[in-house]
Amino acid sequence: MKFFASCAKGLEYLLADELLALGASKATATISGVNVEGALRDAQRAVLWSRLASRVLWPLTEFDCPDEDALYAGVAELPWHEHLSTGHTLSVDAHVSGTAITHARYAAQRIKDAVVDTIRRQGLERPSVDVESPDLRLNLSLRKGRATISVDLGGGPLHRRGWRMAQNEAPLKENLAAAVLLRAGWPRAYADGGGLLDPMCGSGTLLIEGALMAADVAPGLQRYGSDIPSRWRGFDRDSWQQLVTEARERDSVGRAALKQVIHGSDMDPHAIRAAKENAQVAGVAEAIWFGVREVGDLQTRPQATGVVVCNPPYDERLAADAALYRKLGDTLQRVVPQWRASLLCGNAELAYATGLRAGKKYQLFNGAIECALIVCDPIAVPRRTPLAAPTALSEGAQMVANRLRKNLQKFKKWRAREGIECFRVYDADLPEYSAAIDVYQQADGDRRIFLHVQEYAAPATIPEADVRRRLGELLAAAREVFEVPAERVALKSRERGKGGSKYGRFEQRNEIVNVREHGALLRVNLFDYLDTGLFLDHRPLRGTMAQQSKGRRFLNLFCYTGVASVQAAVAGASATTSVDLSGTYLQWCADNLALNGQAGSKHKLVQADALAWLEAERAHFDVIFCDPPTFSNSARAEDFDIQREHVRLLRAAVARLAPGGVLYFSNNFRRFKLDEEAVAEFAQCEEISPRTIDPDFERHVRIHRAWRLTA
């Protein structure tokens, strides 16, 4: 059976790992949650033990839902007397997007009506509504015309552990606190005898969560006590009781063995008082030392190693002070230089203000606030002394370094004139060093440079040892020229095996970097996938379309992460429509639009097979961008082959052009041949490929071809 565990954005991969460790058969991270395969017992175990999940949703039904009548009918088909006992209460949470039903509260009310009417038609007592503590809490997910009705097995938000009696302003949610601790490696550090320190502990969330984690306490034990999370009739009470009994045994053993290695301080005596009250209720007061203390007054800790966790102030209510962040960084380097730090900062600029070198950086959300989590291990990185001579580059690496410097000089004026911050600096210029190197400059914060290195397949006649050596030399040269540490180099290397050369596994860092192109901020992921979310070679064509879209309607087919749509929106397009079969890419597109303040009804996202959608659509557009894949096969659509389907595709796209409109068609199939005779029957067509290649791709002019079509 499949179920869904939701979480805050940025925690998806951590949650997937946690659910697998808890016994799930399969856990796949998606946007703001994890799709899980497992039995009902696995879902109930997650309710009891997950430190990261927000909710655990067990599906009851799924159906097409084009309008409110379909929603009512789909819910009414269920035998609700088998799910809700007589006299029990009901509540519904609803989440809607990309659908004709735009108000979540209205959707929730229609579901309540359907449940109540169904039960009353059976002659049973009408259930009452209790929004605070219902016997059965239902959840509606309505996305793009598809509705899923689920039981919220936890009965509400799982971050509520049951111990928070007092809080200071802007408290940290407990499941986000757990993520900060897990990214810091706190469970392993505790097992190795390390300590835990929070020098700005507020009401104690991080330290209390850390103590309960160290004591092996199930988060759901105190939340539910002797009660059960849900009175849904399908809830397995016997299984739940077995899980609770096991958890209580572990709780007893863990609390008895809990070591007193946890310290917290804060300059606010009211916050410390709240922290002590919360720790008392959580049953860990004796394991945590709390005291009133300024950050700069911290003393050296007795443990040689340990973990610092901290959530410094950063939102509108608690005005962030860069000087405070700097004092925090300086103090930690002085008192716990060899410890590991996991700091949840408001943004990259504040993280940079600490002066600490982040080995890893993650993007998390504290409610609606986007935060930067930096992990420093160790806190104080040894400084290179003037006497230490840098490692000399090999002869081959020096050749690559010289070419990189030459290319940088070559592109300097062009980049300055066009405002280019992301570009290709090397494209197998030296044949024996066969790779592409792309530069991505962070648009915010400390404007860091990231390198994206993609290795090309080497001929089978070249020994593997030589291939590896040359790649190492190329990386060494790139790091020296751009002065970037290894953790800011995303390498997509190839591995030889059966079937030839292929790319190996990528890192799973979930690290998002914001970059800028043509005035638009864009989210790229350099490490987790083969592609980054931004095809640099299409830069000139995107710029042309953005300029032509001002005050006009823009359509982006096979939109990928929606970069062209975002740039058209920023340039002043009256409306944009972005079509892609992938929900993941559409969410990425939505995030890009929101990053630029362009979220709203005039920017439509359509999850559909682009060709089928075109042939059914009746709206017209002024500027259309069509950049299809070479091949595509999906369980949700017919197989697609650009050579076979391009005439049909272009005919359908041209039919959607408004008078005076223009279609830009591009693809990167090397052997593609446009059927000029067939296309001439319905459009005027001009190849514009040379005009769509910027200087950084002049060595690779066949990376794509492009045409301009008008009706």
Swiss-Prot record:
Which reactions does this protein catalyse?
guanosine(2445) in 23S rRNA + S-adenosyl-L-methionine = N(2)-methylguanosine(2445) in 23S rRNA + S-adenosyl-L-homocysteine + H(+); guanosine(2069) in 23S rRNA + S-adenosyl-L-methionine = N(2)-methylguanosine(2069) in 23S rRNA + S-adenosyl-L-homocysteine + H(+)
Q: What class of enzyme is it?
A: transferase
Q: Give the EC number(s) under which this enzyme is classified.
A: 2.1.1.173, 2.1.1.264
Q: Which family does it belong to?
A: Belongs to the methyltransferase superfamily. RlmKL family.
Protein's recorded name = Ribosomal RNA large subunit methyltransferase K/L
Would the keyword Glycoprotein turn up in this protein's UniProt record? no
Q: What is its main location?
A: cytoplasm
Q: Which keywords does this chain's UniProt record carry?
A: Cytoplasm, Methyltransferase, RNA-binding, rRNA processing, S-adenosyl-L-methionine, Transferase
Stored PANTHER family:
RIBOSOMAL RNA LARGE SUBUNIT METHYLTRANSFERASE K/L, RIBOSOMAL RNA LARGE SUBUNIT METHYLTRANSFERASE K_L
Domain (THUMP): residue spans on this chain: 42-153
What does the function comment of this entry state?
Specifically methylates the guanine in position 2445 (m2G2445) and the guanine in position 2069 (m7G2069) of 23S rRNA.
Q: Which organism is it from?
A: Xanthomonas campestris pv. campestris (strain B100)
Location of the protein in the cell: Cytoplasm
Instruction: Extract the GO molecular function terms from the UniProt entry.
Output: 23S rRNA (guanine(2445)-N(2))-methyltransferase activity; RNA binding; rRNA (guanine-N7-)-methyltransferase activity
